[in-house]
């Protein structure tokens, strides 16, 4: 959830965990809605997170717990392509594959950029799909991760997999839909000013 905390907060507000108006305080000084979810301060958060690589480890634990308790739920976790440079990710993947956790779905946002540059230049994790296959994952490659129909098809397929965890590798465009943000690493974690915000929203609304 850390990677997309703003999306998570929006979903929680929609479900009534806290007022939607509080979303306007995202990452403000003194706000309880910060860049990393904090279970002590945010209703609906099951675990605090921060460092890259923690998400998949927690997800593996949840998936194993579900198996041990004969619970039928599935566990989904989102990773960045830069995040999978962390060794902790592959320790968790190794365990998930060895324990045949078919209730686990790992989604990799493969946009090719991370906070300090091009992923391939920083420390290349490619080919991502082959690495997950080596750890006994069923792998689904999504050619356009910004296409909702392709994503839905991938999630539908993941629900049919038995005997092994699933990794959905999505090829995405960072900043998709905003001309001056697309494929620009400088917008990693950066907030637009009022003028940039107005332009971005106009472009997104025009695109539908």
Question: What do these predicted regions represent?
Answer:
Residues 1-5:
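Short, small-residue-biased leader/transition segments that mark boundaries at the very start
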Residues 7-18:
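Alpha-helical support elements that line or immediately flank enzyme active sites
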Residues 20-41, 72:
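Acidic-glycine-rich active-site phosphate/pyrophosphate-binding loop
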Residues 38-208:
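Glycine-rich ThDP/TPP pyrophosphate-binding loop and its adjacent helix/strand module
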């Amino acid at each position: 959830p850390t990677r997309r905390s703003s999306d998570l907060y929006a979903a929680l507000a929609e479900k009534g965990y806290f007022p939607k108006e509080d979303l306007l305080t995202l990452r403000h000084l003194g706000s309880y809605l910060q860049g990393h979810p904090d279970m002590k301060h945010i209703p609906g958060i099951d675990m605090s997170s921060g460092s890259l690589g923690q998400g998949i480890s927690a997800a593996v634990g949840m998936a194993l717990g579900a198996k041990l308790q004969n619970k039928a739920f599935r566990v989904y976790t989102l990773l960045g392509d830069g995040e999978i440079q962390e060794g902790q990710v592959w320790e968790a993947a190794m365990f998930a594959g060895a324990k045949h956790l078919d209730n686990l779905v790992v989604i990799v946002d493969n946009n090719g950029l991370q906070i300090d540059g091009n992923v391939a230049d920083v420390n290349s994790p490619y080919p991502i799909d082959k690495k997950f296959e080596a750890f006994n994952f069923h792998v689904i490659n999504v050619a356009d991760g910004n296409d909702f129909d392709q994503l839905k098809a991938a999630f539908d397929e993941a629900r049919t997999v038995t005997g092994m965890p699933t990794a959905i590798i999505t090829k995405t465009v960072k900043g998709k839909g905003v001309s001056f943000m697309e494929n620009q690493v400088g917008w990693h974690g950066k907030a637009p000013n009022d003028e940039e915000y107005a332009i971005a929203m106009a472009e997104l609304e025009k695109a539908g």
